[in-house]
UniProtKB/Swiss-Prot annotation:
CDD domains reported for this sequence: ASKHA_NBD_ANMK
Gene3D superfamilies: 3.30.420.40
GO MF annotation list: ATP binding; kinase activity; phosphotransferase activity, alcohol group as acceptor
Keywords: ATP-binding, Carbohydrate metabolism, Kinase, Nucleotide-binding, Transferase
Catalytic activity: 1,6-anhydro-N-acetyl-beta-muramate + ATP + H2O = N-acetyl-D-muramate 6-phosphate + ADP + H(+)
Enzyme Commission no: 2.7.1.170
Organism this protein belongs to: Psychrobacter arcticus (strain DSM 17307 / VKM B-2377 / 273-4)
Function comment: Catalyzes the specific phosphorylation of 1,6-anhydro-N-acetylmuramic acid (anhMurNAc) with the simultaneous cleavage of the 1,6-anhydro ring, generating MurNAc-6-P. Is required for the utilization of anhMurNAc either imported from the medium or derived from its own cell wall murein, and thus plays a role in cell wall recycling.
Stated name of the protein: Anhydro-N-acetylmuramic acid kinase
Segments traversing the membrane: none
GO biological process annotation, one example: amino sugar metabolic process
InterPro entries reported for this sequence: Anhydro_N_Ac-Mur_kinase (IPR005338), ATPase_NBD (IPR043129)
Length: 436
């Protein structure tokens, strides 16, 4: 076969294969840095262009519509082990029972298997509750649980055994999204801004997305031209590098950890506990001295930088330097809330256009924290701060939908990273596929 015919045949084959992954059902799964549980969604994508409107109804003229959702708390032992693995030497805090591992490496293997078994149960429950046949689902996008994110060392580790999920659900699984970006010099994070651009960017204005998960990150989405607004088109030929996105600092990670330490709750619902306290300004200023806040973007962070041990160390230093200042645990929660609001709003204000109407759309679990939303609005007086619900997608499901979209990008052979966001040298197809 000559080169021309071979190339033509290959192109035709690829087009046929990738088109089969276009208008179909996908499952997205996400468990964030705060380790509060696993979210799973079932959605359908299409190639129709209208990214400013998203449907939760049966409307195939929309780029995406959400068909079903399900969320499940982690089993207590799995959560305990994952939290331990997130910290250097954290397994020393674990007391193994009969048959459990006795070394860190074995705990990694145990957690990867247990996480996948739990994820499989979550998927099967989602399918059962939505009365969905597995044959209609093209793939699962499963992020896994980040236990180490070391971009300065060139690696990021997400625990999940995709083989188990594929076997137990009968659906192909795309996972390990971050390391391909890191292989071309990127931070491996944040990845969600690429999805934000695909779904939320509009031709006539700039939009800013703020994701408040365990870590906060922003995506600044410039107006897109009509000829480039197709939901399917996301490649090296698009001007996607004009998107800016990066982590801004801690969010729910510290808020939840401090709440769990001092109350009988896992999180500060609505921010009511924080609102009952007073911000300790000298402590806030000390926390803002963390070197991450002055780093230039692209940048990413995680539990390695911001964790309960770091906070307790900072409190100890503060107590030694300011012994005359008295504060309560609620005051610390108020201060941590202000830390998130200030660090995020400071970065958002860089991109605010004083002559235009500006809107910031918030997603992630932090969008449900009314007090945090109030503090963000206070620090962003030139913006209207609202959640992505006003764009048609509830804030708690955005990240799970994003990984369904990333799985689709992988199967279609399309890039999933934004080099200007992650610092990668080029756009690449992300993830590894485990076929059912």
């Amino acid at each position: 076969m000559d080169d021309l015919n071979y190339a033509t045949l290959t192109e035709a084959l690829e087009q046929t294969v990738f088109e089969n992954f276009d208008d179909g059902l996908y499952i997205g799964m996400m468990s964030g840095t705060s380790l509060d549980g696993m979210d799973a969604i079932l959605c359908q994508f299409s190639n129709h262009t209208n990214s400013s409107n998203i449907s939760n109804e049966d409307n195939t003229q929309q780029p995406m519509h959400l068909l079903a959702t399900y969320s499940q708390d982690f089993p207590p032992r799995l959560r305990e082990v994952l939290l331990a693995l997130c910290q250097p030497n954290g397994i020393n805090q674990l007391t193994p029972t009969a048959g459990e591992p006795d070394s860190e490496l074995e705990w990694f293997g145990w957690a990867s298997k247990a996480y996948a078994e739990f994820a499989s149960d979550v998927v099967n429950t989602l399918l059962q509750q939505s009365n969905t046949d597995i044959e209609s689902v093209l793939a699962i996008g499963c992020h896994g649980q980040t236990v180490r994110h070391r971009p300065q060392m060139g690696f990021s580790l997400q625990l999940v055994d995709a083989n188990i999920i594929a076997e137990r659900t009968g659906i192909s699984v795309v996972s390990d999204f971050r390391r391909r970006d890191m292989a071309v010099g990127g931070q491996g994070a944040p990845l969600v801004p690429a999805f934000h651009q695909a779904l939320f960017a509009v031709p006539d204005s700039t939009r800013i997305l703020l994701n408040l998960g365990g870590i906060a990150n922003i995506a600044v989405l410039p107006a897109i031209s009509d000829d480039l607004s197709d939901f399917n088109e996301h490649s090296d030929n698009q001007p996607s590098d004009s998107v800016v996105g990066y982590d801004t600092g801690p969010a729910n990670l510290l808020l939840d950890a401090w709440t769990a330490l001092h109350t009988d709750k896992d999180y500060d619902a609505g921010g009511t506990w924080a609102q009952s306290g007073q911000v300790v300004e000298p402590l806030l200023n000390q926390l803002l001295e963390h070197p991450f806040f002055v780093k230039a973007y692209p940048k990413s962070t995680g539990r390695e930088d911001f964790n309960l041990a770091w906070l307790q160390d900072e409190l100890q230093k503060f107590d030694q330097a300011a012994a005359d200042i008295r504060y309560s645990s609620a005051d610390v929660q108020a201060t941590l809330t202000e830390l998130t609001a200030i660090s995020a709003s400071a970065q958002i204000n860089i991109f605010i256009n004083a002559s235009s109407n500006n809107a910031v759309y918030v997603c992630g679990g932090g969008a449900l924290n009314d007090y945090l939303m109030m503090r963000l609005q206070a620090h962003l007086p030139r913006c209207k701060v609202e959640t992505t619900a006003s764009l048609g997608l509830e804030p708690t499901w955005v990240e799970a939908v994003a990984f369904a979209w990333l799985a689709r990008q992988t199967l279609m052979g399309e890039t999933g990273n934004l080099p200007a966001v992650t610092g990668a040298s080029k756009g690449v197809v992300l993830g590894q596929v485990c076929f059912a």
